[in-house]
Regions:
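Short amphipathic alpha-helix
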Residues: 23-24
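Proline/glycine-enriched tight loop/beta-turn segments at coil->beta junctions
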Residues: 2-7
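Serine-dependent carboxylesterase/thioesterase catalytic core
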Residues: 8-14, 19, 28-38, 46-140, ...
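A short, charged, and often flexible helix/loop element on the N-terminal side
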Residues: 40-47, 174-176
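C-terminal catalytic-base region of ester-bond hydrolases, centering on the histidine
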Residues: 141-199
Length: 199
């Protein structure tokens, strides 16, 4: 059993860049973690999520040695991108701890507002969501998973769409979706999840 601090990769969401993680990055770095993140391009929904997941996979391959385990945090759309990496690009073999924050894991009705390919994939009835969810229990239960959500989320509708019945599910009553990567209660939950022992 080990509680070593793995490098942490942060994956942002729609319209975001790495700067959305400034608070988390600073907090984790000050607590002894090696923190990494990348800008997904394009970030506004014009590319399918598989394309962005390939960017993530390439970044990880070029950043870490093959034998270096890592932990991943995916926020919002980044939660789906990280899940595709884990479930479809063999990321499950690389990642030991996974934190999914306010992601549309079962889709969000907000995604019906725009017809862009990456946004369409976030609809509750999309083939992308259906595909990821048909084997998520089997795949994600192989690693330590934590799902953090707020019932007040107006971007993930319904807010409970983040939950998959896997791993630890933590409800934190943060008022705004964007504050989920800034709230001190969320930061505390993240650090606790990153310190969970690996068998």
């Amino acid at each position: 059993m080990t509680t070593s601090k793995n490098p942490v990769v942060l994956v942002h969401g729609l319209y975001d860049t790495v700067t959305v993680f400034d608070t988390i990055s600073t907090d984790l770095a000050q607590s002894g973690w090696s923190v990494h993140s990348l800008n997904l391009i394009p970030n506004y929904g014009s590319a399918k999520l598989e394309i962005l997941a390939l960017q993530l996979a390439e970044y990880i391959t070029h950043t870490f040695p093959d034998d270096q385990p890592i932990d991943i945090i995916g926020f919002s759309m980044g939660g789906l991108i990280t899940r595709y990496y884990l479930q479809r690009l063999e990321g499950i073999k690389k990642v030991q701890r996974y934190i999914n924050i306010s992601a549309p894991n079962r889709g969000t009705t907000i995604a019906y507002s725009l017809p862009l390919p990456g946004i369409v994939q976030m609809r509750p009835d999309s083939d992308f969501i259906k595909d990821l969810n048909q084997d998520c229990q089997h795949r994600l239960n192989q690693i330590k998973c934590t799902f953090i959500w707020t019932p007040y989320d107006l971007m993930i509708v319904p807010a409970s769409s983040t939950l998959l019945g896997i791993g630890r599910e933590i409800q934190i009553p943060v008022i705004l979706h964007a504050w989920m990567v800034k709230d001190q209660r969320v930061l505390k939950a993240i650090k606790e999840a990153l310190l969970e022992p690996i068998m």
